[in-house]
């Protein structure tokens, strides 16, 4: 029996011990992300959220870049712990979802509606948070 959205929300958790096998087909992940981008509301219908889904080699490449960058910036002792965390909790996964806010959209709204200009950056972050919440909850729903 399928969970309701409320049940999926209550059950949703961060998973840290992850593997490269996904219980959700890649096509379903793409569909979930597209539905969120299309349907999650945003202030002034700004639709400023941008999402990148990395799978396969692109996912691995990202986490190698992260490790190389951190290795150059932190001590060897700290890096060993960090590398273990990255390898066991992030790079070992099936894919990565990256969330961005298009600042050109925010700037355009600030110019168009100067009375609200100080609010648009915050509203943009609210929109990003709603996208993240919607996507992770829909992914939780699809696990059943």
Regions inferred by a protein language model and the residue ranges of each:
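N-terminal amphipathic, basic helical "cap/leader" segment at the start of enzyme domains
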Residues: 1-95
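Sequence-level detector for tyrosine residue identity
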Residues: 15-16, 99, 116
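Small-aliphatic-rich amphipathic alpha-helix that forms the alpha element of a beta-alpha
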Residues: 37, 103, 113-144
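Short, conserved acidic/polar surface loops in the N-terminal third of protein domains
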Residues: 63-65, 107-112
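Membrane-helix exit/interface motif
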Residues: 74, 104-105, 109
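Conserved active-site beta-strand-loop modules that form the wall/rim of enzyme catalytic pockets
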Residues: 93-102, 106
